[in-house]
């Protein structure tokens, strides 16, 4: 029964991307979902795609402030759980402005790299890891912390070190150097 539920979850996760428009095949997928009103091209890297999403302007500004552009343009591969502008706006008042100050660059870098998992973990790989882990997958982040991925009904949920949980709202946005999963909350390291 558990395997059937996981199989249904994989189908829903993959099906969520089927209606999206995308660019040409980059060897990964014939289509990519639209993100923030912009086409995402599997032949472009994470940064070159993210700058076009109107839903990720805060994330892009933070990546620039933390000097992570070069890293996220490198070959990777990376899996990025990308919080939306609304996710950043839901943080306590003043948090984003404080993080973007030059003196807080180490903290900002830690928060951002906590959203990055080395390697390419698309939906099927993530679901396989959840299944292999008996319903949860512990993911080691680029910051050295861990995230826990689980299923809640047909949704993939990602839980941070503080117990906060984000839902993957758009999965499998393939990039030349990895894959992005859009999430609805900012994940915070311990």
Show where each model-derived region lies:
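C-terminal motif of bacterial Sec signal peptides marking the signal peptidase cleavage site
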Residues: 13-16
